[in-house]
Structures are given as C-alpha cells and as structure tokens.
C-alpha cells in the first residue's frame, strides 16, 4: 500500500509521520502512536492496511524512534503530545481519533488531556495511567534492564533505519527512563477526559484485566474490551504476534465499530 510521509517541527524536534488511505467524508483521520522501542512498521505494519481500507490513517514515530531523531530533552508523554499536535496542525487536522499502544497509550492520554478538542475517540491499548498498575517487581526489573533485554525485532528495525553508533543505546535509555519517571495521572485529571474512550487489554498483558476495568472506570463513559492474547498481538505487533495475525483479524471489527460510534 502506498503512502505519503513528512516531518513536522516542534521546537527542534522533527516528528516523522505517514499518511495511509484517503480522507473519508464526515470522519476524522485515525492517528496511531506506537509503543516503546517500536517503529510504525513493527507496531502497526500489519494493522494499517486493514484500517486504511476504511479510514485515513496518520501514524507517527516518537522521539528517538524510527525516523524521528532524538534531541537533548527527555522523552515524556507530554512532550510527545506536543510533537503530535505540531503534526496535526501542519496537516490542518482539527480533530482525530487516536489509538495509542503501550507507552504510546500514555501519549494518547496526554494528548486527550492537553487538547481535548483534538481527540474525538481515544483507544488506550495495553497501557496504564497509574504506577500501581503493575507490581513493584516491574519497576525493579525496569531499573535493572539493559539493552540485552530489548526484543531483537526492535533492535533489528532500529539498526536498519539508524545504523550510526549509539542510536540504539540512546533509544533504549529514552524508553527505559520514560517508564521509570512516569508519574501517572490522578483520578481528577482522568475525570476531565472528554473523548469517547475504549480501554483495550489482553488477558495475558502487562497489566491485568482487573486493572484495565479500573482504568476504564476512572475515565468518564469509557468502554472496556478484553481480548485473548498478550501485549500487542491483537494489533499485529511484530514482536508479540510472531506473524500469527488471527487475534488481530478478530479484534479489528470491534475497534472499527467503536470508532464508528457517535463521538463527543
């Protein structure tokens, strides 16, 4: 499938984006935000053709990921939300439906909080909004993590796009520090989200289905979808799915049905 691409500038950060599919009258584009360590291809390469057949899709790569080069600033959900707003402004997109996966889900939530009018539907996939989402062992493991723990799929994709020495190491540290420093949001903050929201979680995900239900309960009117599988295979994420796309094909109709519902 052919696509167009470009960069949007935001205070020295040049965010890479791709546009797949054609504009659909009456429907905003669907914005995809990959998870940590990922590129558009590794996270959404299998999913985009299914979505772009029915919706125009804009996919981005956050700072240090893929074709978006790192700067000296930290990688945070709020910084990335600002970068994405620069993309939307450059493309004259006033509002979009947004799907953020994992750490990209943090950015999607930050976007919905930063500029509520920019997010019509929000799909928060395999993500969390508070530090109590995961046990203490998760944080201990993240603090001890090294590049050797990074999935080969991510390493290979980054080395092909960015063969210069030190880039992969910088990517890994940006992601690791981002998670370690993640503050989460209060219930009062989450209560201000105006986007129609769907919380998606797999039954063998990083967070539990019980936590996902609690997260959905904190966002006004949010819906909940629990799917079989692990962290991202239901989106065709390359490292998680290993090429088995059955869960993705079963999940997509539910996502499209939610996106087709009347927005706020």
Where are these regions (language model features)?
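N-terminal cap/lid segment of alpha/beta-hydrolase-fold proteins
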Residues: 1-14
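Conserved HGGG/HGGXW glycine-rich cap/lid loop of the alpha/beta-hydrolase fold
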Residues: 11-69
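Conserved alpha/beta-hydrolase "acid-adjacent" motif
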Residues: 206-211
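Active-site loop/oxyanion-hole signature of alpha/beta-hydrolase fold enzymes
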Residues: 45, 49-52, 58-99, 241-249
């Amino acid at each position: 499938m052919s696509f167009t691409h470009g960069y949007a500038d935001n205070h020295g950060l040049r965010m890479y984006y791709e546009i797949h599919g054609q504009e659909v009258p009456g429907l905003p584009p669907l914005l995809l935000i990959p998870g940590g360590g990922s590129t558009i291809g590794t996270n959404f390469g299998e999913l985009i053709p299914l979505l772009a057949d029915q919706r125009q899709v804009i996919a981005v790569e956050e700072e240090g990921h893929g074709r978006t080069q790192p700067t000296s600033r930290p990688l945070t959900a709020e910084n990335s939300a600002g970068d994405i707003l620069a993309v939307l402004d450059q493309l004259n997109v006033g509002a979009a439906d947004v799907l953020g996966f994992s750490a990209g889900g943090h950015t999607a939530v930050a976007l919905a909080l930063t500029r509520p009018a920019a997010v019509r539907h929000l799909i928060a996939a395999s993500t969390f909004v508070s530090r109590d989402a995961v046990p203490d062992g998760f944080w201990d493991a993240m603090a001890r993590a090294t590049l050797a723990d990074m999935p080969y799929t991510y390493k290979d994709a980054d080395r092909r796009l960015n063969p210069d020495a030190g880039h992969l190491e910088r990517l890994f540290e940006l992601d690791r520090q981002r998670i370690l420093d993640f503050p989460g949001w209060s219930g009062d903050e989450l209560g201000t989200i105006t986007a129609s929201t769907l919380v998606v979680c797999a039954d063998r995900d990083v967070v539990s289905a019980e936590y996902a239900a609690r997260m959905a309960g904190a966002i006004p009117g949010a819906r909940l979808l629990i799917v079989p599988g692990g962290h991202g295979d239901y989106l065709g994420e390359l490292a998680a799915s290993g090429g088995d796309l059955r869960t993705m094909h079963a999940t997509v109709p539910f996502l499209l049905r939610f996106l087709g519902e009347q927005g706020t």
